[in-house]
Design a protein with these regions (language model features):
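Short glycine-rich anion-binding loops that position phosphate/pyrophosphate groups of nucleotides
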Residues: 49-50, 107-108, 230
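Active-site histidine-anchored catalytic micro-motif
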Residues: 1-33, 66, 72-175, 180
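Short, surface-exposed amphipathic charged segments that create phosphate/polyanion-binding patches used
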Residues: 57-64, 142-145, 183, 257
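Metal-dependent C-N hydrolase catalytic cores
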Residues: 28-95, 272-285, 291, 295, ...
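A residue-level signal for conserved active-site and pocket-lining positions in enzyme catalytic cores
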Residues: 44, 158, 224
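Short, mixed-charge aromatic SLiMs
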Residues: 22-26, 30, 53, 135-137, ...
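Conformational coupling and interaction surfaces
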Residues: 3-5, 11, 149-151, 168-302
Length: 302
């Protein structure tokens, strides 16, 4: 949200929530609390409480029991809209045809439901940008990233929808992290910056214990990069598909990273048609850009 706030050419039109790091109720409450903290008035609607098939994840504590542990947030000063997130997505896309970028930083269930509810949505959207997947090591499993793994059917539907799509996975976002020293520097700011520091400290501690990492990965802000400053991440137009059936690989994102020539051998499977712009390399400017956006939002929220 800080990056959106700092980008003068973008306008936050709506916020939707989905199950994931915690229950839908907790995630929605967190969104409303953060809106109050940052003085954001965008409408908020709760969405899916579980994936398209089966039940949602249980006992997800990487962000604590509330889904956003580590800081004391203000009590929400409003309730979510009395409509489902899918309806808010459709209303917003219908009102801003050809302009709306749908940024998905959690499970893709709401997006898949919206696309299946209104087939015209794919033509109304300017783009979809996703934080999810990995071309290497996963986090939920050895090869699957959490946001895709919790609802691979939804992810598969979204990637096949034909909407211009940008994807940034763990192999990139894990290289976009803040150190303990950078987190400490945020404490020199106001309430919002100090709250972000508290949240990042908690997350860094969790990542150290669970994954042995020494930086707090800034996963979600990376999804917004192509529409804020395309030079902050290098992308490749290629194919990404979701594994739905593998016993060990369900939820894995399979990306075409080969450089096949014009000569094909019978034992080599040809490339699928490109369907996404896949993040490959973050710029050294990205972390300073995100920290500067947090500081700017902190000043405006004071």
């Amino acid at each position: 949200m800080a990056m959106l706030y700092a980008a003068r050419h973008l306008d936050l039109r709506a916020i939707t929530t989905v199950y994931g790091n915690q229950t839908l109720e907790k995630v929605t409450r967190n969104a409303l609390a953060l809106c109050r903290l940052a003085r954001l008035d965008a409408p908020v609607a709760a969405g899916a409480a579980k994936p398209l098939l089966g039940e949602g994840p249980k006992d997800v504590t990487i962000h604590g029991k509330t889904g956003i542990d580590g800081a004391e947030l203000p009590e929400p000063d409003r309730a979510p809209l009395d409509i489902h997130a899918v309806e808010l997505i459709l209303r917003t896309a219908r009102a801003h045809r050809g302009e709306l970028v749908l940024a998905a930083t959690g499970a893709l269930t709401n997006v898949a439901l919206a696309l299946s509810t209104e087939p015209k949505l794919k033509d109304w959207l300017r783009a979809i940008t996703i934080m999810g997947g990995s071309t290497g090591i996963g986090n939920s499993t050895e090869v699957a990233e959490f946001n895709i793994h919790v609802d691979p059917e939804a992810a598969d539907m979204v990637l096949r929808a034909g909407v211009p799509t940008w994807v940034v996975g763990l192999d990139v976002t894990r290289r976009v992290g803040v150190t303990a020293e950078q987190i400490a520097s945020l404490r020199e700011g106001g309430r919002l910056a100090r709250t972000m520091a508290d949240l990042l400290d908690f997350f860094l501690d969790s990542l150290r214990r669970v994954h042995g990492l020494n930086t707090a990965s800034l996963h979600d802000p990376c999804a917004l990069v192509p529409f804020i400053d395309p030079g902050l991440i290098e992308y490749r137009h290629t194919s990404v598909r979701v594994e739905l059936a593998g016993t060990l690989t369900r939820g894995m994102t399979v990306a075409e990273l080969r450089r096949l020539g014009s000569t094909q051998l019978g034992h080599i499977r040809p490339s699928a048609a490109p369907n996404v712009h896949l993040a490959r390399e973050p710029s050294p400017r990205l972390v300073p850009h995100i920290l500067a956006a947090i500081r700017e939002m902190d000043v405006r929220a004071t």
